UniProtKB/Swiss-Prot annotation:
One Pfam match: CcmE
One of the record's GO cellular component terms: plasma membrane
Region (Disordered): 137-167
Entry GO MF terms: heme binding; metal ion binding
TM stretches of this protein: 8-28
Keywords: Cell inner membrane, Cell membrane, Cytochrome c-type biogenesis, Heme, Iron, Membrane, Metal-binding, Signal-anchor, Transmembrane, Transmembrane helix
Annotated membrane topology: Single-pass type II membrane protein
Cell division recorded as keyword: no
Name listed for the protein in its UniProt record: Cytochrome c-type biogenesis protein CcmE
Compositionally biased region (Polar residues): 151-161
């Protein structure tokens, strides 16, 4: 084998190893690329029981039920589908019906999302585009979603501190 053939063989082998490594990394990160799944996505993907993922949407009004020993249940909706959630623990201060939420956990065999972490979103202006589009499509969109709060000018400024030069 000549030097040129040996060099080409080494380059080809390194290329194959690199392609396999990139493929393995992308396969491992496939489920982590999406920050969360909406209830409609969960229904369409038929996620098996026990697989961990994040569920995002809006807490369905009228669905919150508080039980004993910090147990709560509620439904998360994206306007197109809803999914029951069970959680045991202290809910965030900003958690309320009609508010954005992200829960982390897994589905049980009955199709209930067993959350071990619940994060409340600050307000509707941070609502995911997919959820906002689904709410608009189904006629559940409120006109005050995404509007600035009274006295708010730009992110992090109120009209009072904007007049002082943003201090």
């Amino acid at each position: 084998m000549t030097r040129k053939q040996r060099r080409l063989l080494m380059i080809g082998g390194a290329g194959v190893v690199l392609i396999v490594a990139v493929g393995l990394v992308l396969n491992a990160l496939r489920d982590s690329i999406v920050f969360f799944s909406t209830p409609k996505m969960v229904a369409e993907q038929h996620i098996e029981a026990g697989k961990r993922f994040r569920l995002g949407g809006v807490v369905e009004p009228g669905s919150l039920q508080r039980g004993e020993q910090l147990r709560v249940s509620f439904k998360v909706t994206d306007g197109a589908a809803s999914l029951p959630v069970a959680y045991k623990g202290i809910l965030p201060d900003l958690f309320r019906e009609g508010q954005g939420v992200i829960a982390e956990g897994s589905l049980d065999k009955a199709g209930v999302f067993e959350a071990d972490t619940v994060l409340a979103k600050h307000d509707e202006k941070y609502m995911p585009k997919e959820v906002a589009d689904a709410l608009k499509k189904d006629g559940h969109w409120k006109d005050d979603y995404g509007k600035k709060s009274p006295g708010e000018t730009t992110a992090g400024q109120t009209s009072a501190n904007a007049a002082e030069g943003g201090k």
